[in-house]
């Protein structure tokens, strides 16, 4: 019996270790915020959105509505939404754009307000990156597919004396990655802020955003 007990303990430890690099998304928890744009009038922006900059507006393609950032001017544009949170929160969305020749857009989701953290796909660098403000603090290689919806998940949780950022992306319809793709540990306490979406239309093509969701995540959860 003692041997069986030891085996059970070992199995539990192995399971915890395997879960160590997985996003602790609270998929079953009631969202803190959701927006699919279906109830928003075409040409408008949903009530409660704070447009940092950019001519964002709701567009419709068939039966689907989404928020679109036009392909000009060329700059960085964003929108803040949902409640202001410091940690224990995740943001998810799907984003689509196209390249034009050798010119590529860049886009992503963010947490902790306008100057907080950002999970960004940068096709021109073939990278998935985490930004803190305007500084890239973590990066991993990533091959983006032009014209496909890219699914984003990004979260921040406090674990001990650090705040852990973790993110992953995948093409809609493909299998969601089981593991975190890019992460960053910040020893500096962040400020509370709203979730966000961002776009840089460097390819002069529109960037489209849909299915924005903010959820709570248990603090101290292993990443």
Name each region found by the language model.
Residues 26-51, 221-223:
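Extracellular carbohydrate-recognition regions
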Residues 37, 210-214:
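Extracellular beta-strand elements of beta-rich domains used
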Residues 37, 91-93, 148-159, 163-169:
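Short tryptophan-centered beta-strand motifs in secreted/extracellular beta-sheet-rich domains
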Residues 41-68, 73-75:
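Extracellular glycan-recognition surfaces and repeat-rich motifs
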Residues 62-64, 68-135, 218:
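Secretory/extracellular carbohydrate-interaction modules
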Residues 77-83, 138-144, 184-185, 198-199:
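Beta-strand-rich interaction surfaces with strong enrichment in secreted/lumenal proteins
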Residues 131-153:
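Short, aromatic/His-centered strand-loop micro-motif at the edge of beta-sheets
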Residues 176-208:
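Flexible glycan-contacting loops in extracellular carbohydrate-active proteins
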């Amino acid at each position: 019996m003692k041997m069986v007990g030891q085996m059970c303990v070992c199995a539990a430890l192995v399971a915890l270790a395997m879960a160590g690099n997985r996003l602790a998304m609270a998929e079953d928890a009631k969202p803190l915020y959701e927006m699919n744009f279906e109830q928003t009038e075409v040409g408008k922006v949903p009530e409660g959105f704070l447009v940092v900059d950019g001519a964002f507006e709701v567009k419709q393609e068939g039966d689907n509505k989404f928020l679109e950032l036009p392909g000009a001017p060329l700059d960085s544009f964003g929108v803040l939404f949902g409640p202001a949170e410091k940690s224990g929160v995740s943001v998810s969305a799907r984003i689509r754009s196209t390249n034009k020749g050798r010119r590529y857009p860049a886009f992503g989701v963010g947490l902790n307000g306008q100057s907080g953290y950002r999970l960004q796909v940068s096709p021109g660098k073939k990278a998935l990156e985490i930004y803190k403000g305007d500084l890239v603090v973590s990066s991993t290689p990533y091959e983006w597919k032009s014209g496909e919806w890219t699914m984003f998940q990004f979260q921040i949780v406090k674990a001990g004396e650090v705040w852990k950022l973790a993110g992953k992306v995948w093409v809609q319809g493909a299998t969601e990655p089981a593991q975190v793709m890019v992460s960053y540990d910040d020893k500096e306490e962040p400020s509370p802020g709203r979730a966000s979406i961002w776009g840089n239309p460097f390819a002069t093509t529109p960037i489209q955003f849909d299915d924005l969701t903010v959820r709570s995540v248990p603090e101290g959860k292993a990443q």
